[in-house]
Amino acid sequence: MATQLQREISNLKKSILTLSALVEDNLRRALTAVETHDETLAAAAIDRDFPIDLMEVDIEEDCLKALALYQPVDGDLRFIVTIIKINGTLERVGDLAVNIAERALQLAAAPQPVVSFDMTGMAIKAQQMVSNSLDALVASDAAAARAVLLADDEIDDLDREFTARLNAAAREHPEWLEGVVQLLQISRFIERLADHATSIAEDVIYMVEGEIPRHSVKRAVAEAMGFNGAVPPRAKE
């Protein structure tokens, strides 16, 4: 039974790595289409989402089957639960790639706003966060996963800065409005990519250490406030 479970875990590792490669490849395709205004590349990114969706379903079914047949515990259980969660997150990253590609098609046909901002740089940073979170998964590296968490605030700041500059450009040049709208959406999608990378990194930390990072932050805040795990008293009316 244990040998069969380890064989299933090995197969799940291979499957999630294959899905990761498909998602990263299509994300690069979509972001390149935005940068180059390549409508053919954008259309290809949209078309290549279907195999990603199919594989996500297959991986989830394999995970549920392993849980039912082998009833794993401890590290094996955490691994399978983590794969279920990351599998779903990767599917959402794939959907974002499609959303970006669709906006790239509309942007290519719209007046191009002239904005002093490196959107490509922001996209590369978010894409690198996704890649680094998946590398942390492959290596079971909690430290590398924590480094991904630290990068999220920078993407949030860049998104806010780009949004402000786009809004200013739209006010000064109403003729750019359609292009501004598409870029605003693309910027928001890039910010969500970073959020998904953060989610994957948190799941890796849970898999390796059994610790849910967002709960550990809440616990630290509670301890600093003197709650020490106890339910705080209700205020008197």
PLM regions with names:
Residues M1-E237:
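Cytosolic, long alpha-helical scaffolding segments
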